[in-house]
Amino acid sequence: MSGRGKGGKGLGKGGAKRHRKILRDNIQGITKPAIRRLARRGGVKRISAMIYEETRGVLKSFLESVIRDAVTYTEHAKRKTVTSLDVVYALKRQGRTLYGFGG
């Protein structure tokens, strides 16, 4: 026994998480007020009703491309954990340099 408790390191150890809410479409987790707050930060005064779904779609495609690149860096380094540097390099590759997280 490794003393890890119920979770264990191997697959199939421990039961299901009891209080985990199942989100079928996670992009809906980006709520209308959250999009509104981001727009306010950008100086937007009024927002059309159709903007919310469009924003979710654009955000989803942007995050998919960044995460895909970050995972590629992680796999190349033969690691299983995506680090902040992987994300920084992925953003830099797409021409969106981010400062303050190393690299």
Swiss-Prot record:
Main location: nucleus
One term of GO molecular function: DNA binding
Gly residues bias: start-end ranges: 1-14
Gene3D superfamilies: Histone, subunit A (1.10.20.10)
Annotation: DNA-binding region: 17-21
Residue numbers of N6-glutaryllysine PTMs: 92
A Pfam family it matches: CENP-T_C
Top-level taxon of the source organism: Eukaryota
Residues modified as N6-acetyl-N6-methyllysine: 6, 13
Signal peptide start-end: none
GO BP term, example: nucleosome assembly
Residue numbers bearing the N6-methyllysine modification: 6, 9, 13
Cellular compartment(s): Nucleus; Chromosome
Family listed: Belongs to the histone H4 family.
The protein's name in its UniProt record: Histone H4.2
Taxonomic source organism: Emericella nidulans (strain FGSC A4 / ATCC 38163 / CBS 112.46 / NRRL 194 / M139)
Lineage: Eukaryota, Fungi, Dikarya, Ascomycota, Pezizomycotina
